[in-house]
Amino acid sequence: MNMTLNKRWCLTAILALSAVVYTSSSYAATDRLVIESGDSAQSRQQASMEKEQWNDTRSLRQKVNKRAEKEWDKADVAFDAQDNCQKSANVNAYWEPNTLRCLDRRTGRAINP
């Protein structure tokens, strides 16, 4: 019985010692914490290149937007002109869809209804 108790104490001591060694070794590996802000030379260079590309394509985007706006305005004006031409009291007025103008049937000239 005395021998079994000694074995248990010995085993417990060995387990405790190995646990201490294990935890101290894992603690030693993480005794420093390095936090990077992500602000490295490479990320700054990439951000600079992206900004440059964005600025280079800005004028192109503006041109596309202006053209789309002009086309929209043109279609809007033509729709209003067609509506006014068809509502006109002038019986000789007709809408020419190819030229988007209100014309006189007799003369073929553009009229303002």
UniProtKB/Swiss-Prot annotation:
Taxon lineage: Bacteria, Pseudomonadati, Pseudomonadota, Gammaproteobacteria, Enterobacterales
Gene source species: Klebsiella pneumoniae subsp. pneumoniae (strain ATCC 700721 / MGH 78578)
Pfam families: DUF1283
Entry's family note: Belongs to the UPF0482 family.
Region of interest (Disordered), residue spans: 38-60
Protein name: UPF0482 protein KPN78578_15540
NCBIfam families xrefs: PRK13659.1
Statement: the UniProt record of this protein carries the keyword Signal: yes
Residues annotated as signal peptide: 1-28
Ranges of biased composition (kind: Polar residues): 39-48
Entry keyword set: Signal
Compositional bias (Basic and acidic residues): 49-59
